[in-house]
């Protein structure tokens, strides 16, 4: 499924859209792409 992960880095909030099996994997993929980020939210995209 496609998942929108909202991330926060250095005072900026941005979205990372990833394909993953579940929310946990989506979070891991987004953090692997942006290692210094904090996850704000994880939402499915239809």
Regions found by a protein language model. Name each.
Residues 14, 23, 44-45:
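Intrinsic disorder/low-complexity segments
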Residues 16-18:
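Generic detection of short hydrophobic beta-strand segments and adjacent strand-loop junctions
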Residues 32-46:
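Short, mixed-charge low-complexity intrinsically disordered segments
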Residues 1-14:
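Short aromatic-glycine-(Arg/Gly/Cys) micro-motifs in beta-strand/loop hairpins
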């Amino acid at each position: 499924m496609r998942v929108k992960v909202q991330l926060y880095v250095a005072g900026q909030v941005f979205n990372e859209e990833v394909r993953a099996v579940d929310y946990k994997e989506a979070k891991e993929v987004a953090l692997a792409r942006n290692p210094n980020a904090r996850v704000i939210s994880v939402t499915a995209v239809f």
